[in-house]
Design a protein with these regions (language model features):
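The feature marks non-catalytic terminal segments
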Residues: 2-13, 20, 177-373
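A short helix->loop->beta-strand "cap" motif at the edges of active sites that frequently abuts
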Residues: 57-58, 192-195, 654-657
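Catalytic beta-strand/loop cores that center a nucleophilic Ser/Cys/Thr
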Residues: 688-756
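Short acidic, glycine-rich surface-loop motifs adjacent to enzyme active sites
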Residues: 145-157
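Active-site rim/loop-helix segments in enzyme catalytic domains that contact anionic ligands
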Residues: 2-144, 165, 172-176, 180
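Aromatic-Pro/Gly-enriched surface loop or interdomain linker
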Residues: 554-631
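Long beta-sheet-rich domains in secretory-pathway and surface-associated proteins
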Residues: 375-577
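A glycine-rich, often tryptophan-bearing local segment used as a flexible ligand/cofactor-contacting loop or short
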Residues: 633-718
Length: 756
């Protein structure tokens, strides 16, 4: 997505210099750091964090286990790993709003720390993630970030998501290990002593979870009530704007200003022994540079650090006088430089990283105070190994002599040409861009290719780093787009599998698929037929695409206005699932809302199904169909469906066959009115789902026609289930309904509301 002039103007006007200046000054209030931990993107306690960071100046960070690959997509069709790519970008945008660094425990799409689906057990989760792997990543993140306070979002108790339990349990272990020189010494990072661990003193129960135990007692609270004095926006509202970037999860809601927002916490652990008599989470910690020398037992730096903090406070008070802000920031910078030079080794572990943070924060603020503007653009935002592109810096520095340097990924080269333009060359063996970066910072460049600006303030060299205005995506050496990558061949209705190739790179490559026994492959230019031979058996068949005999990748592109462009490169090929299924008779309609592709897969089987849009639903004559299939969440996501509810009921009573896929209680589902007879969907959902994908499925009514017509459902049909057995089961229903299946997780009561 290349930014247009209108995009740039909109972005500029949404963030004027005076507001950027105010926001850049806030981190100068404090030298403390606070790390929130969770399992998935959107687990952050955003309202509390917004107040801590934007009001109190606390350095914020989040350690998150995985990318939320197992969740649902409220805005598109991407699932699993592609959804993880989108949610990674969403999390970065959400973190940017509240000036929060973000760390992922999972490093790659293949990482064991994966959102494998809902879990009811922290132990099960850690078994799948690998506890040692989880702790290794957690410890590394703590040692890199050096938080004073760690605060998990959820409690490690039964009734919570197993991923949440696992992260909270691991947080306590990781805090201890991060301070242990013998633990993960191969990381080559200094140990770090977290000072406090807080737990939420509120219940995590709700529509999804059902905590079995009450929360721990409140020992202190964070009051997030109120508004930023310059922005005039409540911290809770800023938080909701941040959460609105979790768009695949439908996050973000309007909150009226002035509402109270108080977050009770429990001091669960401290490095000096638990002290529950606190007035603030900042008690016994160096909130500002005023307290740092005493805390670090470094009296010789007391005067210097106090001068620095005094100057920082004066800079904040001087807003929006840029000249005065600049003067005070230089004074602070000078004193911080003296403190770094004179800091004794015995105190350096508690002091130097805080002063390094202050130098970076001051540098960012100085750039705004001096009105240094730099826009970094690329001649193209997709490139191949071996190619070159141009990077241009549009630098406007009216009162300052600024030098721009291009920072390159390893083995890339740069040649300076005219007019602030640089020729960037990519190695011929470069790998595709990483869709799963494991770290994002709000106060520096994050892209491997970026620009560093340097200038002098007196004798002090100051620098900031800037990303290009859009991401650069390095694409594969060999790639192609396939008309289909997953297919179904029904032996009861066999057809040739047709695959066409487009976007072939290099364009003149020779294209072929790997051969498979039982199949014949014919080719006409870039069009292929996969023809099954007589005697082909059921199973999965994979045909890999080769270009000039080389393994090839396909590019899964994603483009949404709230995140920009993203992509993930995957091995190119076609997976064909061969089955033997008797097809139903009659006219079938599908009414969806964009959350499933059931109609797509029915057509792959050979079923003649007509997909009805919301507009078509409004006017369709239902009597024309023998069966109607209502898709996942469709009563919420298909705007016109509820207006035809009575017609649907009448159609069923007249003999129509209605199949409704799963819905949540909040999907415009009225237990008294949506179904033909009373049907209540269970909540919290944790109690009405079976997470074990291999759980035994008991056929309560083995002779029921649903299990026998037109195909007999046997035990083997429940094999190789993905993610979980099922969720959003019915809790109660009218006696008119007959439960067909019984399923349960280990040591839990059986559930009969999966299929009625």
């Amino acid at each position: 997505m290349i930014l247009t002039d209108i995009d740039r103007l909109t972005k500029q006007n949404a963030n004027p210099r005076s507001i950027k200046m105010w926001k850049a000054l806030q981190p100068l209030r404090s030298c403390l750091s606070f790390m929130n931990t969770g399992a998935h993107p959107d687990d952050e306690t955003t309202t509390m964090l917004a107040a801590l960071g934007l009001r109190d100046g606390i350095r914020l960070s989040q350690a998150c286990a995985n990318r939320g690959e197992g969740g649902q997509n409220a805005i598109g069709s991407e699932i699993t790993l592609d959804l993880g790519v989108i949610r990674t970008c969403e999390m970065e945008r959400a973190a940017e709003v509240i000036n929060m660094s973000h760390y992922w425990l999972s490093e790659t799409p293949e990482d064991t720390i994966f959102d494998f689906g809902f879990s009811k057990s922290g132990s099960e989760t850690l078994e799948k993630w690998g506890e040692q792997r989880t702790l290794e990543r957690f410890v590394l993140i703590i040692r890199r970030e050096r938080p004073d306070i760690v605060c998990p979002t959820f409690l490690d108790i039964s009734g919570q998501h197993g991923h949440h339990q696992a992260m909270t349990r691991s947080a306590f272990k990781a805090v201890l290990l991060a301070a242990d020189p013998a633990a993960f010494s191969e990381q080559n990072l200094p140990i770090w002593q977290v000072k406090k661990v807080y737990l939420p003193a509120w219940s995590g129960a709700g529509d999804a979870y059902d905590d079995d135990a009450p929360p721990p007692p409140e020992t202190v609270c964070v009051n997030s009530t109120g508004a930023d004095p310059i922005l005039g926006i409540d911290y809770a509202q800023i938080a909701q704007y941040s959460r609105s970037f979790h768009r695949t999860q439908g996050m973000g809601k309007w909150i009226e200003p002035g509402l109270p927002s108080v977050w009770p916490l429990n001091l669960a652990w401290s490095c000096d022994g638990i002290e529950t008599h606190e007035k603030s989470i900042y008690d016994h910690l160096p909130k500002t540079l005023f307290e740092l020398s005493e805390y670090a037992k470094c009296a010789e730096l007391d005067t210097t650090l106090c001068k620095a903090q005094t100057a920082l406070n004066q800079a904040i008070s001087a807003w929006p006088d840029y000249t005065s802000i600049h003067k005070y920031l230089i004074t602070a910078l000078q004193n911080i430089a003296v403190a770094i030079t004179n800091c004794p080794d015995a105190s350096s572990a508690e002091i130097l990283h805080r002063l390094s943070d202050k130098q970076r924060q001051i540098s960012n603020a100085l750039a705004i105070a001096k009105n240094i503007n730099c826009r970094v653009t690329l001649s193209q935002y997709e490139a191949r190994p071996g190619e070159s592109l141009e990077l241009t810096t549009d630098l406007n520095t009216p009162d300052c002599n600024v030098t721009a340097h291009v920072k390159l990924p390893d083995r890339w080269t740069v040649e300076k040409s005219e007019n602030n333009t640089h020729k960037i060359s990519i190695p011929s063996d470069e790998e595709p861009s990483d869709p799963y970066p494991d770290t994002w910072y709000p106060d520096r460049a994050n892209a491997p290719l970026n620009v560093v600006l340097e200038w002098y303030e007196g004798d002090h060299l100051v620098s900031i780093s800037i990303d290009p205005e859009e991401r650069l995506h390095v694409l594969p050496t060999f790639s192609a787009a396939l008309s289909q990558t997953d297919a179904v061949l029904n032996l009861a209705n066999p057809v040739n599998i047709k695959v066409s190739l487009t976007q072939i790179y290099p364009k003149d490559s020779n294209c072929e698929f790997s051969s498979m026994q039982g199949w014949e492959i014919s080719q006409n230019d870039n069009h292929f037929k996969l023809q099954p031979s007589t005697g082909l058996t059921e199973g999965m068949y994979t045909f890999n695409l080769l270009l000039d005999k080389n393994p090839t990748k396909s590019i899964n592109r994603m483009n949404y206005s709230h995140i920009g462009t993203a992509n993930r490169c995957v091995s190119s090929g076609v997976n064909v699932q061969v089955v033997n299924v008797v097809l139903p008779q009659g006219r079938i309609a599908y009414i969806g809302g964009g959350n499933d592709r059931t109609d797509f897969w029915l057509r792959k089987l050979g079923v003649d199904v007509e997909s009805l849009t919301s507009e078509m639903v409004q006017n369709t004559e239902l009597s024309e169909y023998d069966s109607i299939l209502i898709g996942v969440f469709a009563f919420k996501t298909c705007p016109t469906l509820n207006s035809r509810l009575k017609d649907l009921h009448d159609w069923v009573l007249a003999g129509g066959n209605l199949v409704t896929l799963y819905h949540r209680p909040w999907d415009n589902w009225d237990p008294e009115a949506t179904a033909l007879a009373y049907l209540k969907i269970g909540k919290p959902s944790l109690r009405w789902r079976v997470t074990d994908e291999s759980a035994d499925v008991l056929h309560l009514e083995p002779n029921n026609q649903l299990l026998n017509t037109p195909n007999k459902i046997t035990k083997s049909d429940w094999d190789n289930w993905d993610k979980e057995r099922g969720l959003y089961f019915a809790e109660r229903w009218d006696e008119t309904y007959t439960p067909i299946l019984e399923i349960s997780d280990t040591n839990e009561s059986p559930l009969r509301g999966a299929l009625l």
